[in-house]
Amino acid sequence: MKKLLLILVVFCIATTTASAQAVSEAKIRQQIEAAAASMKTMQCDFVQTKYLRMLNDKMVSRGKMYYQQSDKLRWEYTSPYAYAFVLNGSRVLISKGNRNDVINVNQSKFFKEIARIMMNSVVGKALNDKRDFKVSLSSSATEYVAVLYPQQKQMQQMFQKIVLHFNRQRAMVAKVELIEKRGDRTVIEMMNVKVNSPINAKVFTVN
């Protein structure tokens, strides 16, 4: 479960860097903050593919993500299994099958740290917070690329680096790559992205 939560952190970072359009690192960072401030809601479908180095195989999952400023997030797998993580203020819901677990973020050091990084991400602070990631930004004719090197011990134990790819023409995040220490690789591709469209409040219900 901890690996899933760390993937959610990365996904949050990706959603808020989606509008970067500049070529210089300083300009990109400025535009990230401005874009995050203007993003009230965000929703999309995603396909997650995990490539297993030792087995020469891959596992494909599909789902949906919803975000509402400033402290609501839902990450839901719909195929091949049903699993949902909902963050609503200081409360977290983890739903798997018929089991629902509700956690108070303030009573768990791990969840409190996860929530901090998530919220820093969605308000555009993650790429400037050196406590969490060392970041390298670059651009080409077709895309922007941000390479994140984890600085927190727990993330360093799992990930060697995280690569965010942005479609330069649309100025939207297109793909996230998580390179694990042992060589496995997870790729998350986003599609049908909607920004500042209404989201049903029930999506973020925690009970």
Predicted stretch roles:
Residues 44-46, 62, 161, 190:
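Extended beta-sheet lipid-handling architectures
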Residues 64-116, 186:
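An acidic-aromatic
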Residues 4-14:
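Sec-dependent N-terminal signal peptides
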Residues 46, 73-77, 92-95, 146-148, ...:
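Short hydrophobic/aromatic-rich beta-strand segments that constitute the beta-sheet cores
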Residues 22, 103, 126-207:
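Gly/Pro-enriched, hydrophobic low-complexity segments
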Residues 1-4, 20:
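Positively charged n-region of N-terminal signal peptides that target proteins for export
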Residues 36, 113-127:
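Short, solvent-exposed helix-to-loop capping segments enriched in aromatics
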Residues 19-57, 202-207:
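N-terminal leader/targeting segments and the immediate start of mature chains
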